[in-house]
Amino acid sequence: MAVDVKSRAKRYEKLDFLGEGQFATVYKARDKNTNQIVAIKKIKLGHRSEAKDGINRTALREIKLLQELSHPNIIGLLDAFGHKSNISLVFDFMETDLEVIIKDNSLVLTPSHIKAYMLMTLQGLEYLHQHWILHRDLKPNNLLLDENGVLKLADFGLAKSFGSPNRAYTHQVVTRWYRAPELLFGARMYGVGVDMWAVGCILAELLLRVPFLPGDSDLDQLTRIFETLGTPTEEQWPDMCSLPDYVTFKSFPGVPLQHIFIAAGDDLLELIQGLFLFNPCTRTTASQALKTKYFSNRPGPTPGCQLPRPNCPVEALKEPANPTVATKRKRAEALEQGILPKKLIF
């Protein structure tokens, strides 16, 4: 067995360093057997309290879920093996991510481009939800793009099966800027709505080319949501007041969506409105979103091979042109590391 693991580790030739997080390092590599270019996520084993059978629980969850999933818009897990004090996950190599595309100001994102990105995101998410899995960490840099322009959902370290009656979950999931209001109010029982709210934030970011609701804290995040979308009433969200961390907010009227997304047509505004419904029980699902007029109306989505590719080095695009946004993003991610391990793409 030890020989087999060692031979599997030697099967991959490291080509380049791609990134590093608190618990993992990512490399570009070549599979010597097939000549395929892959990405290897090498995870450092957690402390005893964080590990199960010597494997970090987050990694174990990611392996288990990805082994059961197969969809064109979900990252493929090609191999997984332990070696020395690490566990390595081998993935499809992806050229870039949606965050890089959004930040590259040399690229023009047309309505057809945005529709293509949203179509692939929702198709992958619909598959997940049909298989009773919540992603729980959707954001632009977890939506990866390969050399053919195919978008794939990635980073399943926080993903979770759902559907068991009365099963409680942690509310400290999803990066704050993409976190649904029910999570910010401390909901322990939730469903697909948390992913759909994040999709709404990603769609808004594609349209605006900046993060839509970049809050500094959970309280600030809720304030930004209500100032922008209006403070919900009990009629709009019946169970709001019973949530564990609910606090009363000033009644904000909100800004009409057409004043925020000035170039959006009625069909797109209707989709955005459905994704940002406060009541998670009535919030648009992935299947419902795919059936909206937005996707059946013209223009059609751009084919993957014709989607824009970044013109600038990825490293430069990871530092936004707007230093305020860059600082806030780093601060938000740093604060959340006190609760959650730092997330990495692969």
From Swiss-Prot:
Phosphorylation at Thr-170 is required for enzymatic activity. The association of p53/TP53 to the CAK complex in response to DNA damage reduces kinase activity toward CDK2 and RNA polymerase II repetitive C-terminal domain (CTD), thus stopping cell cycle progression. The modification Phosphoserine is found at S7, S164. Phosphorylation of Ser-164 during mitosis inactivates the enzyme. Phosphorylation of Thr-170 is required for activity. Phosphorylated at Ser-164 and Thr-170 by CDK2. InterPro entries: CDK, CDK7, Kinase-like_dom_sf, Prot_kinase_dom, Protein_kinase_ATP_BS, Ser/Thr_kinase_AS. One of its GO terms (biological process) is DNA repair. Its main location: nucleus. The active site is at D137 (proton acceptor). This is Cyclin-dependent kinase 7. Its EC number is 2.7.11.22, 2.7.11.23. It is found in: Nucleus; Cytoplasm; Cytoplasm, Perinuclear region. PANTHER family: CELL DIVISION PROTEIN KINASE, CYCLIN-DEPENDENT KINASE 7. Pfam families: Pkinase (PF00069). It is an enzyme of class 2 (transferase). It catalyses: L-seryl-[protein] + ATP = O-phospho-L-seryl-[protein] + ADP + H(+); L-threonyl-[protein] + ATP = O-phospho-L-threonyl-[protein] + ADP + H(+); [DNA-directed RNA polymerase] + ATP = phospho-[DNA-directed RNA polymerase] + ADP + H(+). Residues 12-295 form the Protein kinase domain.
